[in-house]
Amino acid sequence: MVNISDFFGKNKKSVRSSTSRPTRQVGSSKPEVIDLDTESDQESTNKTPKKMPVSNVIDVSETPEGEKKLPLPAKRKASSPTVKPASSKKTKPSSKSSDSASNITAQDVLDKIPSLDLSNVHVKENAKFDFKSANSNADPDEIVSEIGSFPEGKPNCLLGLTIVFTGVLPTLERGASEALAKRYGARVTKSISSKTSVVVLGDEAGPKKLEKIKQLKIKAIDEEGFKQLIAGMPAEGGDGEAAEKARRKLEEQHNIATKEAELLVKKEEERSKKLAATRVSGGHLERDNVVREEDKLWTVKYAPTNLQQVCGNKGSVMKLKNWLANWENSKKNSFKHAGKDGSGVFRAAMLYGPPGIGKTTAAHLVAQELGYDILEQNASDVRSKTLLNAGVKNALDNMSVVGYFKHNEEAQNLNGKHFVIIMDEVDGMSGGDRGGVGQLAQFCRKTSTPLILICNERNLPKMRPFDRVCLDIQFRRPDANSIKSRLMTIAIREKFKLDPNVIDRLIQTTRGDIRQVINLLSTISTTTKTINHENINEISKAWEKNIALKPFDIAHKMLDGQIYSDIGSRNFTLNDKIALYFDDFDFTPLMIQENYLSTRPSVLKPGQSHLEAVAEAANCISLGDIVEKKIRSSEQLWSLLPLHAVLSSVYPASKVAGHMAGRINFTAWLGQNSKSAKYYRLLQEIHYHTRLGTSTDKIGLRLDYLPTFRKRLLDPFLKQGADAISSVIEVMDDYYLTKEDWDSIMEFFVGPDVTTAIIKKIPATVKSGFTRKYNSMTHPVAIYRTGSTIGGGGVGTSTSTPDFEDVVDADDNPVPADDEETQDSSTDLKKDKLIKQKAKPTKRKTATSKPGGSKKRKTKA
């Protein structure tokens, strides 16, 4: 049976004095058998020449417990002073062996590593913080390939050290270097502070970090120094104060996990005894108790049973609890008093965040702790307005029958007669006229029962009806530290070995999805009883959670020069780049086209200028546009999408990839396309009105007539003022132009001919006089198309369409309108543009006037 103590506590302390790791490290500059043999030949002058190769073989195949069997004297003799002058690279591991035996500290090892001269470090010019690279995660294959060239250190040799990586290392990517440091127990941070032990500097380091290093006088080393640090550090971080503190923390985590596992065992034993007694007495068994404990899913078996067991999001859970605890008091105040946290005005709460982080579990536990009965509905099953009215509406002002059979003297049953409605997966509901989103938002405004809504995407357009209606409570992905103790408890309970240092990789692989992590452990435990650094890469690759990136993330990733370097191209292949395009193949080409001019290229060919690279990228984008026209044409050549991915996104980005000069901008093409459609519609309307007095098409009207109209309709106001009103109206009547057409014509001009500033120079009295006189006169009207002057809005003129993101269900039949919502389908003449109604009199009506008099006058008008 394996035990977690192999990774924590006493057993780890005994490994500190082992000597097998150091002897293996002697030849670890290149981890090959030849190096080991060569090193053993070098040490053949010592008293025990044949024991060292044997210890190396044992160390490769045995567990850390086997390391204790190696004798200390052989280790001391191998590090005799006569060996040190031989060669610098070969003697360092030998000195490391003696250091490990003499209980050195981490500071002793750091003092032996030469510090970098900060004046010779190349600083990134015009540096801006790169959020994406700072949060980038290394690929498992990348870590395996790059870590293989590093010397292998002792278990937890960097324990107690806080390391910061900055800049570009010569042979190691940022993610791989951080994973290597975490593998040996180091704490890796992004920023430098007084708690930082050492900084590993590379090329193009941040200037602010260099200033911080000088200010705090922190040790700075390069990649070679990082190798020496791993090779020279003793097991368990040595005897320093920081290492001892880290060991105590690991031991405390081990004790907590052990206690929680023991409590789980006791609860299972008590539960099995109760079930056995119930079966003997012939009592009723609940559905959950029928399934044996060993047959349950781990996500159910190890689900939190109280709020203290919820991993992360403590603030969000307490906010939800306070809202629900004060709900009845807020109801008595008619939800008019916000309270201290501002939640007293909301009848409903909206929990939103990524899947698998405990939103539904938190809602259930909060309701149970406060004594509420729970009515849960899956909103994605109750998608339409009809089903929502049938299934949920009647429960909004009802009571729980279960509460009448509970003992009211118990604290948890104080709210037993009340229940809370939990609507899960709200973002899966249908929008539009027949969808349930709008109806559910109405429920949130008038419900007499606490309503908890749960969704993943709060910012979807169809979720806007819930704005200012629900109390928004955001749940975030928990970090590895908040999940670690729970996972270690599960590992102890299920009797398999889980290295605490690989939990970060598990969380990274699943992107903080606790549910997926537990399912991962459940599946792996059937085939192996150990999860450590030897198999974590294979596990991470198999269980990697694929999430479609958003357009901003895709553009930043594609325009990053690192993925086009020699190392980056091996780890992030062409297929991976094309896969980025397919995350959003509608927006990716537009985002690349918008931002490809905002980079500082780092992948230029020798002798190639930035302008030449931009020209090649622009030419390729134009070719991609030709391919897209074929794809979107009537031929529907969707098989050309991979070619379009290369021409429109991958190839242009590869030419100009590097560092972003600013932030990623959203594509302006959408706005410009909408603007062009608007002006095309206005031009078509003006052409339709003026065609009785002109003989040209729309293009000719824009190029030839509109500049003349500008001179005849605008310039007279600047020269003559109010005296030009009559002449301007006369010109408009000659060409059948309306007042709206006058405004539209003035919007068409761009560049030096823009009219915005000129119109502001016209006095306000002239503008108002022009409007009043035009409205007081009758004007010739061109022939209008049928229905073009009357806007829609009646029941007979519009059809209700569901939200474009959802498919209409078979049960989504049209809902008959209520009596009070019935509208007259007859044509409303008040909305006709050509029929004008007299303004209502401003004088106050006398009390003796008949109510029908005004109606008669309105009818005659």
UniProtKB/Swiss-Prot annotation:
A motif (Nuclear localization signal) lies at residues 830-834, 855-860. Coiled coil: none annotated. Residues 803-823 have a biased composition (Acidic residues). Keywords: ATP-binding, Cell cycle, Cell division, DNA replication, DNA-binding, Nucleotide-binding, Nucleus, Phosphoprotein. Residues 1-103, 788-861 are annotated as: Disordered. It is found in: Nucleus. The modification Phosphoserine is found at residue 40. One of its GO terms (biological process) is cell division. Residues 836-861 have a biased composition (Basic residues). Residues 153-243 form the BRCT domain. SUPFAM superfamilies: BRCT domain (SSF52113), P-loop containing nucleoside triphosphate hydrolases (SSF52540), post-AAA+ oligomerization domain-like (SSF48019). The modification Phosphothreonine is found at residues 38, 63. ATP binds at residues 299, 311, 353-361, 456. One of its GO terms (cellular component) is DNA replication factor C complex. Residues 16-28 have a biased composition (Polar residues). Present with 2360 molecules/cell in log phase SD medium. Replication factor C (RFC) is a heteropentamer of subunits RFC1, RFC2, RFC3, RFC4 and RFC5 and forms a complex with POL30/PCNA in the presence of ATP. Interacts with ECO1 and POL30/PCNA. Component of the ATP-dependent clamp loader RFC complex for the POL30/PCNA homotrimer DNA clamp. During a clamp loading circle, the RFC:clamp complex binds to DNA and the recognition of the double-stranded/single-stranded junction stimulates ATP hydrolysis by RFC. The complex presumably provides bipartite ATP sites in which one subunit supplies a catalytic site for hydrolysis of ATP bound to the neighboring subunit. Dissociation of RFC from the clamp leaves the clamp encircling DNA. Belongs to the activator 1 large subunit family. This is Replication factor C subunit 1. The lineage of its organism: Eukaryota, Fungi, Dikarya, Ascomycota, Saccharomycotina. The gene is RFC1.
